[in-house]
Amino acid sequence: MSQPIPSASPALAALIERAVARVRHALPADAPWPEGLEHPLARVALASDFVVDTLARQPALLAHLAQPDPPPLPVPRLDPAQPQEWAAQLRRYRAAASARLVWRDVLGLDDVDATLAGATMLAETCLQCALQALEQQFATRHGQVIAEDGSVQRLVVFGLGKLGGGELNFSSDVDLVYAYPQAGQSDGARPLAAEEYFARLGQQLAKLLDETTADGFSHRVDLRLRPFGSAGRVALSFNGMDQYFQREGRDWERYAWLKARPVAGDIAAGEAWLETLRPFVYRRYLDFTALDGLRDMKAAITAEVARHARLDDIKRGPGGIREIEFLVQSLQLIRGGREASLRERRLLPALQALVDLGQIDPPTGQALAEAYRFLRRVENRLQMLRDAQTHALPQGEPERERIALGLGYAHWQALLEALAPHRTRVAAEFAELLAPRVHATAPDTLADYWRALPEGDAAPLLGIGLHDPNNAHHMLADFAQSSGVRALSDGARTRLDRVMPALLHAAIRATQPDAALRRVLGLLQATLRRTSYLALLDEQPSALARLVDVLSRSALLAERLAAYPLLLDELLDTRISGPLPDRAALHTACVDTLQIDDTEAALRELNERRLALSFRIALATLDGRQQPVDSTQQLAWLAEAVVQTVLQLAQTQLQAAHGQVPGGAFAIIGYGSLGGMELGFGSDLDLVFLYDHPREVEASDGKRPLEAGRWFARLAQKVMTLLGAETGAGRLYDIDVRLRPDGGKGALVSSLASYRDYQRDRAWTWEHQALVRARAVAGDAALCEAFVQVRRETLTRVRDPALLHEDVRKMRARMRSELDRSDAGRLDLKQGAGGLVDLEFLLQAGVLGQAAQHPALLLACATPALIDALVQVQWLPAESAAPLHHAHATLVEAGLSCTLDRRPRLVVSTPPIRDACQIVAAIADAQQLRFQPGKGA
């Protein structure tokens, strides 16, 4: 026979030859020796004494493995009449199936991912097979557990750790937790309470799998991850589990339950209960407190490694498997409450999700994935050698040679050289994530000042850039002795003492240091009860610096951050400085919330997304990464998406209660800034509601029908209620419906026919002006198109130019007298002379006067598009286009700047603003639309 492993030492070659001979000898005398088996068997014998032992005990298995692509083995059927055979059947099956896993792995038929999945599937199969047999046995002895509501209760077996993640290594124990949905009692001749019933069942299951017999074991079972550990009950009801995690749940248990999965018993009930546990595992907001618990866990493992000299442990040692797991899981826990894609049990998909979200850069993600697969492959080979639960690199030369050659390396040193870069990279990435916060060693006057408060005086604050050091001192002293600070735990107080000096240094570097400090303290006061935000600022210095910068430049964002600390998450989102979402992405972000079954929860999530998205738009505006005119358009797109989402929510609610109006249609028309796609931060929405339905349909078709008109009125009311409902994230929008037909005196909803009649017969010129900027933003497509037709019919009416201009001027004069807040030194950007409303009136007059001849004008609603359209039809001279665009952009930018800093839109008339207003006024004059002078003129 030729040498099967050419590079094997003589001793190893002899060992392999003896192993092959042992397998051959175990075959019955009349059994044929499969052709071509010598070399594959030698390779497997090199890698695994366990497989050789198994083949010696089960020689018939060899013919199965000798197939070109050995399929799965048949699952044993445990005969209820022969429970004494169950253990042997399970152990023989597990040994044979494990031998198949080794065979496929060593011969390259499976990659490491498939091997891990196969080991997981084998454990699940044994669990399910054993539990099914035991359940039948218990039902015969004790009956089934029946809850108070009459439902049959079954045991739920949760797999944690690598079993839950579908990544079980070859010779791993299985971490199990037992639970059951409801309390009750069994209904058999020897009844048991549910707790006792399921505890006994769980203990029998563990024994059937774990106990070592003449046939070995099936799977080592570890029940220590259950609530209260070894001291806890073997099985708990879901209610008991809930109470435990609400009162006793610890940080390390979040890591343990991150991968949890029901693997046997009542799978559906287990999955449903895990959904209720999700808020414990994944906190709603960014949660950097998870890193403290992780540091403690890692420190304990590091101490154990050092104590037992386990530096060669590829699981727990430096740069080992555990560090990759901890790194990925910690980022999952920090962000998984906000990012559903991170709620992933499997490590490699979770790692890819982190890359996709920009939390790990692609090269690092690839390096970690390669390291993980390499380490798991080595780990499996260490365990496959003798079916031992080991993670330590071997010390003996024979074992080293076998592992190295089996993995395709010429010698042990070559394997170590391949392993070292992986461990080095993993250790470096892990250290960067979990490096303990460094305490300042150099003297820091501000740190000393803060720790001394409320004692001391303002002296340390003098000469460092504050305009009013004494006031700053009083603010800081009041904060230091506030009830919120006094109530902090020792750990949170330590964090605050680290954060405060950094915040003070950042504040005095700000353009407005006093305002920055005042706003920082307001934010801290609002967030002290959530220590996760202190942890965020402590763990992420870049977020701290960014926060103070934003607070110093925007009173509005300071208010929003203090009111809704969830926005702090946005400062760490890598997307915050990238391209802003387009119209389709904004729509998707909003309508995705409809997947949440609970209306209140969906509304809260929608609110949070609106807050986050408008915050991103505000930051882009503040940083100059986006033109203000573009920001107002994006804010309108966002509002449009929110209205569309809320309409669907409202329709679902109303239809559940009252059915729907057959053939009926409903549409929401956006007027004003929403219609003109020029929405500001905090703007309300001008809405008009339309409906239509077949004449013969009088009512909705539900169990509690409503008259058709009333149904649509109720729908409009629901939309308004949902848009204005208070949630933990505030409310969506304030709504103004006064632009509907007949204003405040009119019906909340208008039929299409009455709306058409009103626009034709009774609407004032100013209402037709408002219609210029109106557009359908949500609802039935056919009705929206019908609105477009009504708008077209109305706006293309032939008008007397002189009367039109007179009406426009009169309305503008009335608004000026009532709304213009300009004075001798300041201009009202919106209502002042040459301001935004003058520009709107100019363009609206142009459309009303020209649309009969040029209906293409009606395609435009937004100011920039209206300017271009009126130039195109030569109502505005071509040379006025650029100045008007510039004037509009200047006024919008000034207005947004005021809003972002919480100032009224009354500004000193600087040269750029004065020029913009003069351009608008001059062009209006040229069109015979000389508007009344402003109050400050």
UniProtKB/Swiss-Prot annotation:
One Gene Ontology molecular-function label: ATP binding
Region ranges (Adenylyl removase): 1-436
Cofactor dependency: Mg(2+)
Keywords, ordered alphabetically: ATP-binding, Magnesium, Multifunctional enzyme, Nucleotide-binding, Nucleotidyltransferase, Transferase
Gene Ontology biological process terms from the UniProt entry: regulation of glutamine family amino acid metabolic process
Enzyme class: transferase
EC number: 2.7.7.89, 2.7.7.42
Cited Pfam families: GlnD_UR_UTase, GlnE
A Gene Ontology term for the protein's cellular component: cytosol
Record carries keyword Metal-binding: no
Reaction(s) catalysed (UniProt annotation): [glutamine synthetase]-O(4)-(5'-adenylyl)-L-tyrosine + phosphate = [glutamine synthetase]-L-tyrosine + ADP; [glutamine synthetase]-L-tyrosine + ATP = [glutamine synthetase]-O(4)-(5'-adenylyl)-L-tyrosine + diphosphate
Start and end residues of each stretch annotated as Adenylyl transferase: 443-937
Family, as annotated: Belongs to the GlnE family.
HAMAP family assigned to the protein according to its UniProt record, in alphabetical order: GlnE (MF_00802)
Role: Involved in the regulation of glutamine synthetase GlnA, a key enzyme in the process to assimilate ammonia. When cellular nitrogen levels are high, the C-terminal adenylyl transferase (AT) inactivates GlnA by covalent transfer of an adenylyl group from ATP to specific tyrosine residue of GlnA, thus reducing its activity. Conversely, when nitrogen levels are low, the N-terminal adenylyl removase (AR) activates GlnA by removing the adenylyl group by phosphorolysis, increasing its activity.
Name of this chain's protein: Bifunctional glutamine synthetase adenylyltransferase/adenylyl-removing enzyme
